[in-house]
Amino acid sequence: AWRHQYCGLFWARWNDCTYYFIDNEYYFKRGTLYGHYDDAERFAFFSRAILEMLPYIDFHPDIIHCNDWQTALVPVYYYLFYSHRPWYYNIKSLFTIHNIQYQGEYGWEVNTECVGIPASETKILEMNGKLNMMKGAIETATRVSTVSPSYAAEIRDPWFSWGLHDELNLRHYKLCGIKNGIDTESYNPETDYQLYRNYSKDDMSGKGECKRALQERLCLEQRWDVPLVGMVTRLVAHKGLDLVRMGLEELMNTENMQFVILGSGDKEYE
């Protein structure tokens, strides 16, 4: 909007790929990525910086891939402010929804303060009387994806959409689900150097050693006969933490089990 802030740009080359980093310590030198009072301003700045930096690095991307509400303003800004400029012609955008519960929903005062959408175009972001960044991305992105085909179907249902089902059903033609996966080379237990012991489908003995090492590191009783359940995730209801909380106490009291949960998120689960 009307504010001006320093924006630095750093780059690094690793594994034949160039990475660029937006620099502004006022916005980004924080202990955590999200959950700050000025998140709307921080991510509006970041989204605008992504588009502004492209001519400076002389890079014309075929596609800009945006993830969740934190970069939802990128396709909105491109549509309103950049798509008509010759240098920016024909850049496509893909917006991926990882968790539809978090939509970047704010009062309209943030538009005047930092988002900066003209009054004549605010309908792009309007939902239930508020500014909704994810809604704007769904409307303006070239394509919208989710982390699985089943999730793409779920979020078109009012029960799972957190209010965005009408928008998604209206634009169902550009919505698809692409199943999340892992890099099977990096996360290969037979070769992964970060494991305490390597193992494979033909020799599983190393897995028991990894379990024992984890028990030792976390000061758990080192027993091979006790199931050790691990969960690394965002600690939010969307990831099933409400179900975990319901069952965890009963299992801990009635079964001989060990649980290791790693993550951050909602205070009630932390």
Feature annotation, model-predicted:
Residues 1-270:
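Catalytic cores of nucleotide-sugar-dependent glycosyltransferases that transfer UDP/GDP/TDP-activated
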